[in-house]
Amino acid sequence: MVGGETVKILIHACPQRMWYVEEFLAPGLEAQGAENVEIWNDTEGKGNLISCMESFAARQGYGGTWHIQDDILPCRDFVQRCREYESDGVVYGFCCEQFQDDPQRSGRVKVEDCWHSFQCVRIPDEYARDCAEWFAHRGWARSTLPELSILRGKREGDDTFFREYLQLEHRNEHVTNAKPNLVEHVDWIVGGSVLHQWRGYLARASWWDDEELILDLKEAVKGKVQYVV
């Protein structure tokens, strides 16, 4: 691990949650010292999978980018912790048991033991570009994970496809599962998929204990929530 690196952050957003991204999420990251925060807004409504792959294809250079969703809350030292992981390849910053993650598999792990959740993940830009190409030309036909028979034509899963890409193309490598988690999933506060018919539970981080930060956010966004999927 190294310190002092410039942290690149890409927020994956939908138009209905841009109020949270622009008023809270992006400014909060900048207040922590983030110098390179981009927003990838799915203005055409292509869905999380296609929008994600397009953002992967657009990555440049050979560093890494932290990809975060528009319904997360970063920890108080998020940017500093990201700097500490800047030489660690793929880093998963969020774990959720309801999303089939094993919270006990933390630290440096084999690709097969990586967490699944895509709320916060550092991806080398070279991997992102390669994954986008893999998805476009080979990934759909070669998909073997059981979930994909459900995903085709139904729910989209950028996290599932990226995990399969790692398992097929980088199976002998290791990734990092960051404990404590770097973000909390707050769709139940800012509006999101918590009330969607397919999920009726709170998908919260397994390793998060800053409830004061959660309460502060709830108070700050009171009366501002505009969207529930």
Regions found by a protein language model. Give the residues of each.
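Peripheral/terminal regions associated with large enzymatic or DNA-binding modules
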Residues: 2-68, 72-229
